[in-house]
Amino acid sequence: MTTMNLLLLIMSTLAAMAFLTLVERKLLGYMQLRKGPNIVGPYGLLQPFADAMKLFTKEPLKPSTSSTILYITAPALAFSIALLLWTPLPMPNPLINFNLGLLFILATSSLTVYSILWSGWASNSNYALIGALRAVAQMISYEVTLSIILLSILLTSGSFNLNMLITTQEHLWLILPSWPLAMMWFTSTLAETNRTPFDLMEGESELVSGFNIEYSAGPFALFFMAEYMNIIMMNALTTTIFLGTFYPTHSPELFTTSFTIKTLLLTSLFLWIRAAYPRFRYDQLMHLLWKSFLPLTLALLMWSTSMPIAISSIPPQT
């Protein structure tokens, strides 16, 4: 049964990622007063399959001066981590019910940095290396904020277990009392997934394509798939943390429907932001984190620590 659940999770995740690419192209098209892809299949619905077929049937070219092992390992690692991150998410039941689910997600997502750094260094290209260094600095910096925000939320729920977060939010979504944290979390997830306006690692006008410039065909597709799977995963995590869905025991499918709708709305907001906002300058990106987000999150962490003590209400113990 576990193997079947794992296969279903992988297949549904890949299907969601494939159609997210189509939704993004359609949404960007309509926001720029054009149609977007509409040739392959009815209304362009088969476009993701055409893209996959084209990418995976091309010959993968490797630069002669690249480091072969790291060059091949990097995209495989990125894709594996993107799949692994889904295991503890409650949808409505997690594949593996970790007591430290949030800690597992935070630790595993940090490993993505290695795949980006390896790909940039192994490509033996200045553009790729600069893109990789930018991405690593950005992701490591914003993980500081994500960790502190998660710590504040954990002090409210009293557990690292994602199911306990849903129990905590049975009567009130955490986005209402913790809206400053939710806003900073959402902005940090944009930076963590390297999306507009924080897509400095693949600034087309400066770095052509960033860390994956020397990749083509299948390996490039693996990076591309990992990026879009991380976007959906981050929004699913945001839904669990701040928009916790009540779990009705009489009809569990209501949980899944509600969870999916909220995740889709947040993902659509990601795409809308890409169409609406220009790219940040690198110094603005770092100033936003170290001069604005970090002091604010530390202050709110102190608030989350002191308030339960002040009003004599400890969080639920597991």
UniProtKB/Swiss-Prot annotation:
Primary localization class, coarse: mitochondrion
Any single GO BP term: mitochondrial respiratory chain complex I assembly
Pfam families assigned: NADHdh
Keywords: Electron transport, Membrane, Mitochondrion, Mitochondrion inner membrane, NAD, Respiratory chain, Translocase, Transmembrane, Transmembrane helix, Transport, Ubiquinone
Gene Ontology molecular function: any one: NADH dehydrogenase (ubiquinone) activity
EC number: 7.1.1.2
Swiss-Prot/TrEMBL catalytic activity: a ubiquinone + NADH + 5 H(+)(in) = a ubiquinol + NAD(+) + 4 H(+)(out)
GO CC terms in record: mitochondrial inner membrane
Membrane topology per record: Multi-pass membrane protein
EC supergroup of this enzyme: translocase
Regions that span the bilayer: 3-23, 69-89, 98-118, 135-155, 171-191, 217-237, 253-273, 294-314
The keyword Glycoprotein is assigned to this record: no
Origin superkingdom: Eukaryota
Oligomer status and interactors: Core subunit of respiratory chain NADH dehydrogenase (Complex I) which is composed of 45 different subunits.
Similarity comment: Belongs to the complex I subunit 1 family.
Role of this protein: Core subunit of the mitochondrial membrane respiratory chain NADH dehydrogenase (Complex I) which catalyzes electron transfer from NADH through the respiratory chain, using ubiquinone as an electron acceptor. Essential for the catalytic activity and assembly of complex I.
Name of protein: NADH-ubiquinone oxidoreductase chain 1
Species whose genome carries this gene: Papio hamadryas
